[in-house]
Amino acid sequence: EFGILEDGETIFVYVNGQMLGSSKTMPTGKERLLDISHFYFGGDNGEEKGNRHVKVRNVLLYNRVLSASELQCRLPEEVVQKPQSASPTYLKARI
């Protein structure tokens, strides 16, 4: 599971309930931790040729911050397997 929290000043990135990093400002250029060009709900209309796409099976949207224990209880036993040839920002999840 992947989560992004923005509190007005800082952006926090979580993977499987563990904080991956945070930043007071969105990094640009070589400073980027994650390169997410767009994130939207709905179908892919095919306009973005040549880009990698990730399908998200389940999306949960909250209007509050979840505690670490709430995030941990959402995780199935065997959650993430990293493909050997994948870049660090792409994870293969079993949901």
Curated annotation (Swiss-Prot):
Check the UniProt entry and state the signal peptide residues, or none: none
Task: Write down the Pfam families for this protein, in alphabetical order.
Answer: TS_C
Q: Which InterPro entries match?
A: ConA-like_dom_sf, Sialidase_trypan, TS_C
Q: Which Gene3D superfamilies match?
A: 2.60.120.200
MF terms from GO for this chain are: exo-alpha-sialidase activity
The protein's role, per its UniProt record: Interferes with the efficient assembly of the host C3 convertase. Could protect parasites from complement-mediated lysis by sera from a number of different species.
- Please state which protein family the record places this protein in: Belongs to the receptors of complement activation (RCA) family.
What protein is this chain from? Trypomastigote decay-accelerating factor
Query: Which species?
Result: Trypanosoma cruzi
